[in-house]
């Protein structure tokens, strides 16, 4: 780890007294490997906290971080009504249409009109040119949101995902809002020692009534900027002095551009065929000659264009960093569905491929927690997926997982599918009340999530091996449940069994599943040791 020294004993004791105000709060990921979720490798552009010219096309253009949930990188919105008219660019942006405005990180912009939601009309104070800009790419000048180290409403778990990257050195840091104390902040710092390896320490930044800030009351600062600068110069009780700002990729824009929803077919180019299913194909493509996207083409007759367009209006409002973002549609047959592009394809193919062989339980559980996070949002929005399985989860670089194809299953008009029997219907993933009586709810999605956990722990094996669909339905009705997969801890199999309870209301919520999986290696399996496969 590049000259890491053991910290002195007294420093360790002082650190424990400072951390989170309660003592030594840190999170350790067992057996850290190169699989550090939520980071993607370089492609183009720039990322906050590093030198320019490093960005991932998938995340930059289609990363799914949103304004309706905790966002990794979006600044808090501040309107121009209060006299704040000058904003600063947080990232580079290349225009995608004639009405867009290109700008560079650090450029100052005057907001002309911010009443149109996700895209604001702005004028560059550098070039004098005007055009539309993505509102989540700018922050008010001289505000905390404009600081490279300020990550806003990022969760504790996401801060750890970002910091626990093997490219980061000891002392890499970020500042975020406290999840537990309103108005307070948290300083998250990457640490390393020979016993725990890489781990993240979290220090609560408390606010004085007079407006100042402190981690320990003997050292107080009038601004957060002064606090950060102080701990850059001296560890002063922290696990390490602050070194680098945590790198983060550009967030996605909300939509492809202003007013780009129902788009002409000729604005899309199908570049590389990625897959084919019962109802259509999936392509990597390009929109408007500028923007990489994924395009799902549906066979004519698969669903009613009118019903699809109505459902798509709901689907496009679902915005969460763990849901694949719906960007645009071609609403005449053959229907095209345009979404963000995920570079590693479906989770099922990923698990069965070369990368799958290298995955161990910490990475698999982290992927499961990301899926549960996306589904917890679906749960909060009172929506239902209806077809949750590894084939409908997409993987980005560095094990970012996102839920795809939510809500589409309801619209399929194929007789063999709607009868819930035959090869086209995913019986093995479907809860009995949904398969037998068509009762699809978020609780039938929870059942499917339990099946998905078996796909993860068996690296993509088909559920109920050796059994045909009809047999599965009969056996499950009689109380049969799949046994614990090889090397899978009993505690994880017990979680699967709770997802497969006969009575839907007795199954856990996705909110519970997310919390259980995020804390799995601290609360449930702290003694985990890697095995041959898991």
From Swiss-Prot:
It is a lipid-anchor. The active site is at residue 387. It is found in: Cell membrane; Mitochondrion inner membrane; Nucleus; Cytoplasm, Cytoskeleton. GO terms for molecular function: ATP binding; non-membrane spanning protein tyrosine kinase activity; signaling receptor binding. SUPFAM superfamilies: Protein kinase-like (PK-like), SH2 domain, SH3-domain. Widely expressed. Residues 1-50 are annotated as: Disordered. InterPro entries: Kinase-like_dom_sf, Non-receptor_tyrosine_kinases, Prot_kinase_dom, Protein_kinase_ATP_BS, Ser-Thr/Tyr_kinase_cat_dom, SH2, SH2_dom_sf, SH3-like_dom_sf. Residues 149-253 form the SH2 domain. Residues 7-23 have a biased composition (Basic and acidic residues). It catalyses: L-tyrosyl-[protein] + ATP = O-phospho-L-tyrosyl-[protein] + ADP + H(+). Its EC number is 2.7.10.2. Residues 268-521 form the Protein kinase domain. GO terms for biological process: cell adhesion; cell differentiation; epidermal growth factor receptor signaling pathway; negative regulation of extrinsic apoptotic signaling pathway; negative regulation of intrinsic apoptotic signaling pathway; progesterone receptor signaling pathway; regulation of vascular permeability; response to yeast. The modification S-nitrosocysteine is found at residue 499. The modification Phosphotyrosine is found at residues 185, 417, 437, 520, 528. One of its GO terms (cellular component) is plasma membrane. The modification Phosphoserine is found at residues 17, 34, 67, 74. Myristoylated at Gly-2, and this is essential for targeting to membranes. Dephosphorylated at Tyr-528 by PTPRJ. Phosphorylated on Tyr-528 by c-Src kinase (CSK). The phosphorylated form is termed pp60c-src. Dephosphorylated by PTPRJ at Tyr-417. Normally maintained in an inactive conformation with the SH2 domain engaged with Tyr-528, the SH3 domain engaged with the SH2-kinase linker, and Tyr-417 dephosphorylated. Dephosphorylation of Tyr-528 as a result of protein tyrosine phosphatase (PTP) action disrupts the intramolecular interaction between the SH2 domain and Tyr-528, Tyr-417 can then become autophosphorylated, resulting in SRC activation. Becomes activated when its major tyrosine phosphorylation site is not phosphorylated. It can also be activated by point mutations as well as by truncations at the C-terminal end or by other mutations. Heme regulates its activity by enhancing the phosphorylation on Tyr-528. SMART domains: SH2, SH3, TyrKc. Interacts with amotl2; this interaction promotes the translocation of phosphorylated src to peripheral cell-matrix adhesion sites. Non-receptor protein tyrosine kinase which is activated following engagement of many different classes of cellular receptors including immune response receptors, integrins and other adhesion receptors, receptor protein tyrosine kinases, G protein-coupled receptors as well as cytokine receptors. Participates in signaling pathways that control a diverse spectrum of biological activities including gene transcription, immune response, cell adhesion, cell cycle progression, apoptosis, migration, and transformation. The SH2 and SH3 domains are important for the intramolecular and intermolecular interactions that regulate catalytic activity, localization, and substrate recruitment. Belongs to the protein kinase superfamily. Tyr protein kinase family. SRC subfamily. This is Proto-oncogene tyrosine-protein kinase Src.
